[in-house]
Amino acid sequence: MDYTTLTTQDPLQNYTESALASTSEDSEFLYGLGGENSPGHYGGIVSSRAVGGFRHSPVLQTFPLHWPETSAGIPQSLTTYGRSPGTLPLYPSAASALGSITSPPLYSATPFLLGSAPLAERDGSPKFLETLKTERTSPLTSDILSLEPRSPSLLQVGYLGGGGQEFSHSLFQSTEDRECVNCGATVTPLWRRDLSGHYLCNACGLYHKMNGQNRPLIRPKKRLIISKRAGTQCSNCHTSTTTLWRRNAGGDPVCNACGLYYKLHNVNRPLTMKKEGIQTRNRKVSSKSKKKKQLENPFEPPKTGVEEPSPYQYGPLLFHGQMPTMGHMLSPPHHFLQSPRMSHSTPAVSYRYSASGVTPPELA
């Protein structure tokens, strides 16, 4: 199929596609590639009734355009081409047919183009310097866009959406390199300040606020609160450290151990029982006692010495109707639920249940 370009002498004819014709009052952008006299790259919104234009369906059927090799551009009068559509300039300059176009210019996002400008319009060219003066901000993006000529075949990513919001680098960094002046911590859920304005971590700040002094750096070990009185000694064992000071019948101060011993036995505590350390009730349970408690079974029936080992441990304590109710406690295998088969030579053992408990077995 041949594509015929429009010269400046011929009026712009209505060109519609039969299969893709649109009946709405659509407006199209007209792109032009020309020399110095023709506009570099603009789009005029032209009504289909006022001036004949190129009408087609919303599916844009465009072909890639090539840049002019020189700054002079493409000649105004062009002939019919028989080449492939990819080598044709789709919209030549039609400024003389349309007259002066006062529509707002079409912005092209320079940073987002997937191509580069022609070599003739780079640094040093007066046209390139003009484009730098006419930079403005696009209403869709916050980036600075220039009005230099661009090919419509190139993908203009700037029109696909608004420009990305620029975040300051400080938002992705932790707060200033702060350090607690007391403990040296650099990470804390909340920074606080002391009276002099220095940074404190949350723990040190709360401690200083509650106690009025700096938080101790070394965590003290958990120890008993020992009551110390200057010059106070037990009248019995003559110790000066105890968890609680008591008084004997005569009103003299005694330590906790001597006071309890006298309270229980009405006799003074012998000096041989004096110990250097203070024994507390927080005694650790030995591992042996733990194992014994685990091995002991509270549901095990008392053994009389005559019973045979039952295949099911809880059999003697359970009636037949109680098995479903204790299903959450016992999950024996299916073959254990059946009564064990006894040999003919072994005498059968019968159990009698009474209100008082299990009676000794009787041989049949």
From Swiss-Prot:
Keywords of this entry: Activator, DNA-binding, Metal-binding, Nucleus, Repeat, Transcription, Transcription regulation, Zinc, Zinc-finger
SUPFAM superfamilies: Glucocorticoid receptor-like (DNA-binding domain) (SSF57716)
Gene3D superfamilies: Erythroid Transcription Factor GATA-1, subunit A
BP terms from Gene Ontology: cell fate commitment; negative regulation of transcription by RNA polymerase II; positive regulation of transcription by RNA polymerase II
DNA-binding among keywords: yes
Biased composition (Basic residues): 281-293
Coiled coil start-end: none
A single Gene Ontology CC term: nucleus
Record localization: Nucleus
InterPro entries reported for this sequence: Transcription_factor_GATA, Znf_GATA, Znf_NHR/GATA
Residue ranges crossing the lipid bilayer per the database entry: none
Protein name: GATA-binding factor 1-B
Organism of provenance: Xenopus laevis (African clawed frog)
